[in-house]
Amino acid sequence: MPNILITGGAGFIGNHVVRLFVNKYPEAKIVCLDLLTYAGNLANLKDVEEAPNYVFEKADICDFPTVRALLERHHITGIIHLAAES
């Protein structure tokens, strides 16, 4: 089973990608990583927050030990990187 990490998943583009993957690939575990700064909004993901294949993790992608632990804990097999400060 694939385990996909989507960084910036609560942002403008990321939330659309998260919802697409959660709904299109129910066999995959979709992990949304976002720091929830000015652009991230969990309300964007309200419709998938109870999905069995969806997990939200609040963390900074610049915090390497935290990201490494997250990758190991969720057995991530692929990453879609959309996190950015603009």
PLM regions: where:
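N-terminal Rossmann-like NAD(P)+-binding domain of SDR-like oxidoreductases, especially those catalyzing
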Residues: 1-86
